[in-house]
Amino acid sequence: MRALLVPVGLDLYAVPMDAVREVVRAPLLTRLPTAPALVLGLFNLRGEIVPLLDTPALMGLSRIHGWSFVAVVRSPLGPAGLAATALPEPVALGEAVGASESPATAGTYAVGQRLAVLLDIEALLGGASLPSHDLLPSQSMQGAG
């Protein structure tokens, strides 16, 4: 299976390539004071408003510090950005070396000498823990450019 490795500090997360739209450098963010802590803010991606999510916080882990790239993924609620501390890169995953620890993951895979947790984007980003896009500004910005 092809996946995008999303590095977050010393941890690696893998996202199935069919869920990945693109990777971008850290964008200018608009913070949302009333948003859940896992929403770092919103950014404009060529006229489309995309929430940037704290990748480890989605998994119930400590918050990210110093992110510099964003993996933009397709989710049941629309596009979402996963924060990364280094440039995400595509890889071919072999057989899983560990079972899923959470309903939002699909196993653990060996990548070189490291382990990567494969994220189930639909389960992870389709959950009730995320704000509905109805609460966020319009997905397209008229006249933005």
Question: Predicted segments — roles?
Answer:
Residues M1-G145:
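An acidic, low-aromatic, low-complexity terminal/linker signal
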